[in-house]
């Protein structure tokens, strides 16, 4: 009996030691990858002939890509150039043959997570292939998965809230979906085209800007969050190009804007600039506590290149959201983000290869 107990105890200890060694080894390698500035890329392919992507616009200010999947079905995927990790929402797993193609991997050395390879989800080869995320590490079971994929996150409180206020969202496509490609987003005509490059010869045109990206020593993009500039009241302000910027309205906000919608397109501005605008322009419209994140201000005129457009709504965000948060994925500290409340006035072409953006009206 004592021998059996000893063998059992030794077996348990050995098993625990094995898992401990595995866990700390994987954590070590994952940390080295996350600290590295090396860039993970998908197989390079030539730019294809420009292609109109099936898209659904919301109020002409935000958009969902209609991803074609099996059984002639589609996935409504929210397009967000300012977003992070791309994912497939858990509520979409039963569409088409998605469930048959789901895989289970390991993150952080121990946590299981479901994912689907992008090639197993999207059936139209004309659709752009997202860039693999260099910092989000999934292993299957031990080897790192380097192919483009969409993870299926657990249905936790933050995701539940996101899907509650945007129930049509079946997938989320963040920065890595847009990287390595060129896009034309025509807001007035509610059309999106991909493979629409801007050559370096465009740089001297008045309504073309050079974008900033966080890069490594080899000048390769580490992240895909683009910085650019806008001008308000004579001041040039660095901002994030953010197609997914969204206001989540409070009940007070719904009353102020005369809508029963839970969300509207938005743009964001740092509190220091917001407070300056409030002090210098008390006549500008102001909507206190209209957004769950804070107050909203209406700026009459915003200048992009030679164009003056407006009015444009901005939601206040604390300065630390930019100086301590977004700086981790951007080339500089920006002071805000321009979303659909400003972009709706333009036909925008953005090229992640030449790092150029052009605004047309």
Walk through the language-model features, giving the residues of each:
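Pepsin/retropepsin-fold aspartyl endopeptidases
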Residues: 2-361
